[in-house]
Each structure stands twice: as structure tokens, then as C-alpha cells.
Amino acid sequence: KSAVANLMLSGGTTGFPKLAPLEYEQLYVYANAFSEKCNMNEDTKYLAILPIPHKFAFCSPGILGTLLKGGTVIVCDDVNYDSVFKIIEREKVNITSVVPSLLKIWIEVLEWDNSYNLTSLQVLQVGGAPLENRIAEKACELLKCKIQQLYGATESVVCCTDLSDSIETICSCQGKPLLPEDEIKIVDDSGVEVLPGKTGEILAKGPY
């Protein structure tokens, strides 16, 4: 269980492309905890829109989390909004993951085109970049589903909002650490923890 299971692409803290080794136990603990967080079960239908080699679509909870709970994974090979919306409508997709730039296009389309039936969608995860408050609010209004924000690194701890959080909370933060054992603090250049509201470097440690 401590053997390397996957070499996952990451920009890490430097932005320079690299491969991050993830172990079997790490992937299982992470995907299982996230699937519980998203209330996944055998009725879950997850649409993989983003690149599968990325941690977001692969196991946040993504493909791995869905399969752990006995759900169904639908893989999308075209991110064009029309193709995606038709798959959601046809397959009755109830959870998927996007980046803010993609969600912005969805909102722009849905503001003038209400011909798509997206009522099956219950959870929309958004991560990879900051999410504008206006886009988050519009997404809740037009898609009528729960928005979940994510923030984290391929190599380490991830934070996310709860499905029960208010729209105000979802728009103002990236949530809390996924696991109770996760530790996160912000330090200055000397490694000393900074006060709330101050800028610093994020340090994170998890149980895997």
C-alpha cells in the first residue's frame, strides 16, 4: 500500500512542470474521503470533463471516488458546452468538475439559452483558479445545484467547501481541509506562523 501507484503531473509550488509520485494508500484515503464529502453512492453519475491525468478529475473524488462507491463514470472527449450539456442531459449526470474559465462560458450560454435540461446536476465542483463571486452566484441561480470550491496541490492536502455551506461561504473561501488529520498553516520567510489576514507561505501536512 506504500508503493507508488501513479506519477501525476503537477506544477507544484514553483509552476515548473514535474511528476508527483502518489502512493496507493494516499490515493485511496483521499478519494474515499472526498467521495464521502460529496455523498457519492451507486446512483452517482460523474462526468469527467477535465484531463484525467490531473488529480481533480482523477480522484477529487473524480473517477476513482465514483468507482469506489459503485457509481458510473462518463468520460467526455469534447469540452464544447453543447457537447457537455447534451451528455449531462442524456446520461442524467449528477456531479462533475470544471475550472472557472469553463464555468464562465457555461454561464454566458445559459443566460440566453434555456433549451438544455440540466436538472439532474446536483453538485458542480470548481477549482484550479480563483472563482469570481458573480460567477459562483450565477452558477447557483442558473444551474440550481450545489457549488463546491476546491483548493490544493497534487502532492498534498486539499481544502474544499461543504455542500451544506451557504452561497456567501462558497464565494468567500475555498473551505476547510478535507481530512481531520490534515494540518495547514501560513508562515513568514522565517517559518513563523503569521496572524490571520497576513500574507505568507502555505505549509500543509496530511496523514498519508
Q: Can you describe what each PLM-predicted range is?
A:
Residues N80, L102-L103, L131:
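Alpha-helix capping/helix-boundary segments
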Residues A5-V29:
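Conserved AMP-binding A3 loop
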Residues K1-L9, F16, N39-K45:
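Conserved pre-ATP/AMP-binding loop-to-beta segment of ANL
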Residues K1, K18-P21, A48, G71-D78, ...:
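Short beta-strand->loop structural element characteristic of the AMP-binding/adenylate-forming
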Residues V93-V98, I107-I170, E183:
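Gly/Ser/Thr-rich phosphate-binding loop
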Residues I170, K185-A204:
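Conserved beta-loop-beta connector loops within the AMP-binding
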Residues Y28-K45, K55-I95, V109, E181:
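Conserved AMP-binding/adenylation subdomain of ANL enzymes
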